[in-house]
Each structure stands twice: as structure tokens, then as C-alpha cells.
């Protein structure tokens, strides 16, 4: 079982959504999958990122509600960002 390590930025992002119970319930399902190394179903569009986030993974928890993480392939996964495309990828 992997350890989930939330970054400081992820914690800030999480606070913005803490009152949206529906989104957080879906997020918890994804986090449990990551922790137990269960493959994330295709319906969440898990994929590798490029550019500034090369090597990181992303999935669509709900519509435009995204999770970005980095899997160290040891026993730790860094939870990096949480939010919409415009929030996470603005130039």
C-alpha cells in the first residue's frame, strides 16, 4: 500500500473544495485506488502529462475537476494539484 503525500499546493487546492461533498467523495474513491495501486478506470481519463508536468499523471474526477499526482514507484505518491484546467494549466 502506497503512502499519499499531499503537497502544500494540493492542501490549498483541497481547501477550496472542502464544502463540495460530492466532488470530495469522488476524490476519495480515486485516492483509495491510488493508495492500493488499483488501476484507475478509463472513465476518469487517467493519462500522463507533458510540458511543465512531464512525468506526472492526471485524471478527471468529474468533468473539469482534475487531480494531478506523481508516483515515485516506491511507496509514495505525491498529490500535487486539484482543480479545473484553467486553474491548473494557466500560462
What are these regions (language model features)?
Residues 17-24, 37:
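Residues at alpha-helix boundaries and the short loops/turns that link adjacent helices
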Residues 27, 45, 55, 63-65, ...:
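A generic structural signal for short beta-strands and their flanking turns/coil linkers
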Residues 33-60:
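A short, surface-exposed loop/turn module that caps and links secondary-structure elements
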Residues 3, 12, 19-22, 59, ...:
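Enriched for short, Lys/Arg-rich terminal
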Residues 24-33:
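PIN-domain endoribonuclease scaffold, especially VapC-family toxins
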Residues 9-13, 30:
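A general alpha-helix detector
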Amino acid at each position: 500500500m502506497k503512502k499519499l503525500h499531499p503537497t502544500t499546493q494540493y492542501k490549498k487546492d483541497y481547501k477550496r473544495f472542502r464544502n463540495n461533498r460530492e466532488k470530495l467523495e469522488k476524490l476519495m474513491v480515486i485516492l483509495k485506488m491510488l493508495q492500493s495501486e488499483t488501476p484507475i478506470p478509463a472513465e476518469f481519463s487517467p493519462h500522463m502529462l507533458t510540458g511543465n508536468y512531464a512525468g506526472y499523471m492526471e485524471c478527471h474526477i468529474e468533468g473539469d475537476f482534475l487531480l494531478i499526482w506523481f508516483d515515485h514507484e516506491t511507496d509514495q505518491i505525491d498529490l500535487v494539484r486539484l482543480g479545473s484546467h484553467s486553474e491548473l494549466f494557466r500560462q
